[in-house]
């Protein structure tokens, strides 16, 4: 049983994922941005350190799909879910992508032809003013026409590629000058009367094709793609057999440190979820967080096999000028309240400013990797 001390792993495991992995990771990870996503190098270490080939991993807070894709690369079976539609789209794009660049381009050209035929039928009347403010009208019509085709075909990969170029100031993107990670216009830095070229019509077709080619720059060697798609379901609605999961590797939401839906509101709108607020249910106090995690840990204990591992990546939260060790709360719940779990190790990982999306926000500056073992 764990006492009140915090146990640290003697080996400095976090050294394995220090530094940027953008130039070496599978480029599927870069299909579209996702705020606060787990580094692929961390996911790789956790999967290889705590699971074996062909074992089944569960990630019920899948986010950008990092664990899901790295699990398939490592020849593990993956079951994953999330309540955020953008997270589900992004994850399914990564785990069900066309096998080759050639097949992806063939599908893209087919969809672009269909969108071209149907774009005159697209109505702009119900498009909110704030969405219109990001695009040249001709570009927006093309984007809407293509999304209509992709949603009808349920092609997650193509949708994710299009979502990945929705907004930025660079020439390869579709919007007026804007931030890439979080949607806000940069009209003060790039005023229209000075930077007229940046406010002209941007054709969708060549930009989508170029994006797809970038995504296939470093294709992972996948013997088998996931046979299960990521589902949009909350953790308490998961229907899994008792003692069926070898390991859980996930990063649960912690005390409202990030606003995933708000930060992806433009992408959410194009996916058909205009009221993004309902997907950011704030876990903004200790009581709500404890309730969520207690229920989650009960479910995790039920579905894990005996001696199965539950690896939770949890950030340290700052509230009212003090830091809250959320990991300690989770360990106490698992070991003392739920029981049946033993804490094997806790690994501290300091998040450098370059990895944080909001440099001056009250977010996480430190992460804990909590490793729990199911004992009975």
What are these regions (language model features)?
Residues 140-249, 255:
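SAM-dependent nucleic-acid methyltransferase catalytic core
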Residues 29-34, 126-138, 281-291, 312-328:
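Acceptor-substrate binding/catalytic loop of class I
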Residues 43, 55-74, 78-85, 91, ...:
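Conserved proline-anchored active-site loop of SAM-dependent methyltransferases
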Residues 290-306:
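A short glycine-rich, Lys/Arg-flanked "PGG" loop and its adjoining helix->strand segment in the class I
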Residues 131, 253-292, 318:
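Mobile active-site "lid"/loop adjacent to the S-adenosyl-L-methionine
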Residues 318, 324-327, 331, 338-376:
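Class I S-adenosyl-L-methionine
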Residues 1-52:
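S-adenosyl-L-methionine
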Residues 86-154, 272-280:
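Conserved phosphoryl-transfer catalytic core
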């Amino acid at each position: 049983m764990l006492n009140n001390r915090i146990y640290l792993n003697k080996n400095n495991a976090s050294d394995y994922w220090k530094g940027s992995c953008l130039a070496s990771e599978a480029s599927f990870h870069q299909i579209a941005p996702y705020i606060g996503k787990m580094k692929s190098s961390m996911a790789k270490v956790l999967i290889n350190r705590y699971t074996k080939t062909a074992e089944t991993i569960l990630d019920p807070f899948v986010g950008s799909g990092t664990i899901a894709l790295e699990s398939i690369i490592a020849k593990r079976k993956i079951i994953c879910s999330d309540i955020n539609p953008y997270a589900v789209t992004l994850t399914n794009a990564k785990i069900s992508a066309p096998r080759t660049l050639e097949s992806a381009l063939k599908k893209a050209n087919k969809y672009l032809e269909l969108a071209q035929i149907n774009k005159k039928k697209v109505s702009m009347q119900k498009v909110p003013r704030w969405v219109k403010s990001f695009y040249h009208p001709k570009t927006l019509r093309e984007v809407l026409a293509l999304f209509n085709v992709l949603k009808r075909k349920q092609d997650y990969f193509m949708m994710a590629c299009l979502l990945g170029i929705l907004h930025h100031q660079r020439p390869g993107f579709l919007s007026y000058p804007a931030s890439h990670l979080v949607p806000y216009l940069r009209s003060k830095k790039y005023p229209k009367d000075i930077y007229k070229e940046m406010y002209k019509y941007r054709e969708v077709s060549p930009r989508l094709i170029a994006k797809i080619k970038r995504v296939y720059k470093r294709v992972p060697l996948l013997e088998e793609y996931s046979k299960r798609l990521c589902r949009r379901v909350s953790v308490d609605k998961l229907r899994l057999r008792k003692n069926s999961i070898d390991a859980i590797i996930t990063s649960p939401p912690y005390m409202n440190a990030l606003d995933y839906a708000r930060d992806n509101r433009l992408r959410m709108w194009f996916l058909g979820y205009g009221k993004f607020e309902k997907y950011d249910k704030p876990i903004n106090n200790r009581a709500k967080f404890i309730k969520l995690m207690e229920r989650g840990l009960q479910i995790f204990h039920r579905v894990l096999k005996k001696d199965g591992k539950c690896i939770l990546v949890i950030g340290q939260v700052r509230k009212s000028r003090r830091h809250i060790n959320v990991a300690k709360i989770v360990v106490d719940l698992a070991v003392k309240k739920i029981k049946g779990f033993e804490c094997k190790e806790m690994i501290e990982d300091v998040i450098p400013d370059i990895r944080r999306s909001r440099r001056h926000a009250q977010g996480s500056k430190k992460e804990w990797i909590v490793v729990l073992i199911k004992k009975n």
